[in-house]
Regions:
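Bacterial N-terminal signal peptides
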Residues: 8-15
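Sec/Tat signal peptide C-region and signal peptidase I cleavage site
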Residues: 17-22
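Bacterial N-terminal signal peptides that target proteins for export
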Residues: 1-8
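Short microdomains enriched in Cys/His and/or Lys/Arg
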Residues: 88-104
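Electrostatic cytochrome c docking/interface patches
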Residues: 24-59
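The canonical Cys-X-X-Cys-His
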Residues: 62-74, 130
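C-terminal capping alpha-helices of c-type cytochrome domains
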Residues: 107-138
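Short cysteine/histidine-rich zinc-coordinating motifs and their immediately flanking basic loops
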Residues: 79-86
Length: 138
């Protein structure tokens, strides 16, 4: 019985932590959009700008000049990392429901990929546009 008294609060805390991390692509889009609006009055995410960003050749890296280098021209299709040759699940949440459901994970990958491909951190506006493109603005 004593074990249950200690175990129950730990389980409740763990489930609360998991629900804090759970998100939807719409939640991430709202968050990045709000951050962008705090930097640019009147900002509205644009799937069209996100598509252009996705297809743009940045040229920072010869091996990874664009998002499409690893993620293919179609974000609903699986990709492959051009350096490690590891498979990459589709970016679009319509093809991969796990995408953009964890803010920490999304921020980690934006941080890593933006530096490697774009050559700098992506702005909140770029992230919002990118998510708008991949989710159809939903």
């Amino acid at each position: 019985m004593r074990t249950i008294h200690f175990l129950l609060p730990a389980l409740c805390a763990a489930s609360c932590m998991a629900s804090v991390q759970a998100a939807t692509p719409a939640d991430l889009l709202k968050g990045y959009s709000a951050e962008a609006r705090s930097q640019q009055t009147g900002f509205t995410p644009s799937a069209q700008r996100g598509a252009a960003f996705y297809a743009r050749t940045f040229g920072v890296s010869a091996k990874m000049p664009a998002c499409t280098s690893c993620h293919t021209d179609d974000p609903t299709k699986a990709g492959r990392h051009v350096v490690t040759d590891k498979p990459i699940k589709p970016l679009a949440p319509s093809a991969n429901p796990e995408r953009f459901t964890d803010l920490a994970k999304a921020d980690k990958w934006f941080g890593r990929n933006c530096k490697e491909v774009v050559g700098r951190d992506c702005t909140a506006a770029e992230k919002a546009d990118f998510v708008a493109f991949l989710t159809g603005g939903r």
